Design a protein with these regions (language model features):
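Extended, charged catalytic domains and RNA/DNA-binding interfaces, predominantly
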Residues: 1-249
């Protein structure tokens, strides 16, 4: 429809892929790449109602939906659906995190088009960046190939959420290449930075720095993204945070 109508000012997402099993034969399921509209389709849902749906393999049975779409050529960032399909019409717990310069329509749409988003099942402020040499790139960026690469993740969790981060997974070209446990990492990797809020609560915050060693740095084309799991009351939260990929150009 985007291509047929020639719409110039629009943004489109791949919404809840694979969710409606009963109508799967009629769903746009192949993620066929189209260079004429690649700049218009900007997001893919990784959380929708039942998060378990998106932890399983995608249409091909081997990769997650986000990986199938990205490996088809799309430049995408993850988002969540906030609707709950609840008869009481209450919002779901999933969140879309948009890293914008200010709280305005223009800034939010600019961030969306730059793919500076993340998807989470609980409120968290998060910003990931890639450090290539001395140049820093925000999440969703196309970054140059290099012999050195660091992924930096800054986060703030409101204290009232009582949620901790359990582990972080580094996925390179759709495969988990590293798992970092966050409960027992050294202070060099995770530094608490207390910050005050208007309510006086002190959120948990920190910075996670991950060195991607040379053998694991993908060549072009390639991509890297983070998947972060949380825990609450000692139990693992099954729906992870998805951070927008960094694309190797």
């Amino acid at each position: 429809m985007v291509k047929k109508t020639g719409a110039k000012r629009c943004t489109v997402i791949f919404a809840h892929p694979g969710f409606h099993f009963y109508r799967k034969p009629f769903e746009f399921s192949h993620f066929k790449f189209d260079k004429d509209i690649v700049d218009k389709i900007i997001n893919i849902e990784t959380h929708h109602c039942d998060p378990i749906t998106f932890l399983g393999p995608g249409y091909g049975g081997k990769l997650l939906f986000i990986d199938e779409a990205v490996q088809s050529g799309w430049w995408l960032a993850p988002i969540s659906s906030n609707d709950s399909h609840d008869y009481r019409n209450v919002p779901g717990k999933s969140r879309i995190g948009v890293v914008a310069e200010e709280l305005s329509q223009k800034a939010i749409f600019s961030a969306l088009k730059k793919r500076m988003t993340f998807a989470s099942s609980f409120p968290i402020q998060l910003f990931a960046s890639a450090l290539v040499g001395d140049q820093q790139y925000p999440m969703g960026s196309h970054i140059p190939t290099s012999e050195t690469l660091k992924i930096i993740c800054d986060f703030v969790i409101p204290e009232e959420e009582k949620v901790g981060l359990e582990r972080i997974e580094v996925l390179i070209n759709g495969k988990v290449k590293a798992i970092k446990k966050l409960r027992d990492v050294s202070n060099a990797d995770l530094t608490a930075v207390p910050q005050s809020t208007a309510s006086g609560a002190r959120p948990e915050s920190g910075r996670i720095v991950i060195d991607i060693n040379k053998p694991n740095i993908p060549s072009s084309p390639g991509y890297i993204y983070l998947r972060i799991f949380g825990y609450k009351a000692g139990k693992l939260i099954p729906s992870p945070i998805y951070v927008a990929p960094f694309y190797l150009k």
